[in-house]
Regions:
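Core dinuclear metal-dependent hydrolase active-site scaffold
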Residues: 1-39, 43, 110-186, 270-301
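Metallo-beta-lactamase
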Residues: 160-211, 216, 225-233
C-alpha cells in the first residue's frame, strides 16, 4: 500500500493525497502557492460560505482538469443570506457568492448535515443528501456551526477511504460540541480541528468544550489548524485571516495538556507536507538543520 500525504495549507485548508483519490477541505491559497498548484483533487469539500473557507480564486484554479469531479458545498454557498454584504459583514461578499459565479454549476453539489446541532429550539428537517458513496470514499456530514440562519446549515465532513481504512473529520468553524457527534465515535482517525474550545491567556475558559468533543468522537489523532504564525514561510500572508498565535508551542501544549490522554495531538506546520506510513497511519516526522547564513557573521567579531 502506498503511503499517504497530508498538508495543512493554513487557516482551515487541508488536503489528503491517497494516490488513487485526492481531496481537499476549504482550500484557501495565496501567492506562489496559488500560482504553482495544479488541479490534483478528485473532490473538494467546503464547510461554509465565509471567504476564508469558500475562496473563489482558489476554487477557480482547482475545480478543473481531467481529474476533478465535484465540489461539495453547504447550502449557503449557493443560496446565501441576502443582502450578502449586510448579513455577513466582512465574512462573505456579494462578489463571491453564489460560488457558481466562479465554478461551473454542473460541478457543484449541495449537501446538508446528517448530524444536527439542534437543542430543540429549531426542530429542523432537511431533504438531503446527507451522505455520499464516491466509490473508494464514503462521506458523512455534520453541522459545523456559524450558521447564518437556521435554514442555512454549515457542513463538516467525515471522509473515509473504505479499502485503506483511513478517515478524516474536518469540523469547519464549529464552536460548540453537541450530542449527535457521538455517532462518529471511534470512526475518526484524523480530527482536523479549528476554533472549538480554545482558551487564550486570560480569556474565557472554553477548554471544557474541547475535552467534550474529543470525548464524544474519540479520534486517534488530533490536528490543530485555523491559526497563523509570524513565520515568513507561513502560507497565509501577513494581514490576512486568521489571527496570529503569539506562542505556537504554548498553544499546542495547552491543547495537549487538555486532551493528550484521549488522543495524540499532531503539531503540523502550515505549508509542510507530511507523509503517512501506510497501513499504520503513522506520521513520518522529517526535519533537517538549515543554516541561515552563507558566510558566518561572527567571523567579523
Amino acid at each position: 500500500m502506498k503511503n499517504a500525504f497530508l498538508r495543512w495549507w493554513g487557516c482551515g485548508a487541508f488536503d489528503v493525497i491517497l494516490d488513487d483519490v485526492n481531496f481537499a477541505f476549504d482550500p484557501y491559497l495565496f501567492g506562489q502557492n496559488l500560482e504553482g498548484i495544479e488541479p490534483c483533487y478528485d473532490y473538494i469539500f467546503i464547510s461554509h460560505e465565509h471567504f476564508d473557507h469558500c475562496h473563489p480564486k482558489t476554487l477557480q484554479k482547482l475545480c478543473r482538469g481531467e481529474r476533478f469531479k465535484k465540489l461539495f458545498v453547504n447550502p449557503g454557498c449557493i443560496t446565501p443570506a441576502l443582502p450578502i454584504d449586510e448579513k455577513y459583514g466582512d465574512a462573505a461578499f456579494d462578489r463571491d457568492l453564489p460560488i457558481t459565479k466562479h465554478v461551473a454549476p454542473e460541478k457543484v453539489e449541495v449537501l446538508y448535515p446528517k448530524y444536527l446541532q439542534d437543542d430543540g429550539q429549531w426542530n429542523r428537517k432537511f431533504h438531503g443528501p446527507f451522505e455520499l458513496d464516491l466509490g473508494s470514499l464514503n462521506v458523512e456530514t455534520i453541522e459545523s456551526g456559524e450558521n447564518q440562519t437556521p435554514d442555512l446549515p454549515t457542513c463538516g465532513y467525515l471522509v473515509t477511504h473504505k479499502e485503506k481504512q483511513i478517515s478524516f473529520l474536518h469540523i469547519g468553524d464549529l464552536h460548540h460540541p453537541y450530542p449527535a457527534l457521538r455517532e462518529l465515535r471511534d470512526k475518526v482517525d484524523f480530527f482536523i480541528h479549528m476554533k472549538l474550545g480554545l482558551t487564550e491567556w486570560q480569556g474565557s475558559n472554553l477548554t471544557d468544550r474541547l475535552v467534550e468533543i474529543v470525548e464524544l468522537v474519540r479520534p486517534k489523532y488530533f490536528i490543530p489548524t485555523h491559526y497563523r504564525t509570524d513565520r515568513i514561510a507561513d502560507p497565509i500572508p501577513e494581514g490576512h485571516w486568521p489571527p496570529n498565535v503569539t506562542d505556537t508551542c504554548a498553544f499546542i501544549e495547552l491543547i495537549r495538556e487538555a486532551i493528550g490522554e484521549q488522543t495524540q495531538v499532531l503539531p503540523f506546520t502550515a505549508g509542510v507536507e507530511y507523509e503517512l506510513e501506510m497501513p499504520d497511519k503513522k506520521v513520518i516526522w522529517k526535519w533537517n538543520w538549515h543554516n541561515s547564513w552563507s558566510v558566518p557573521p561572527w567571523r567579523e567579531g
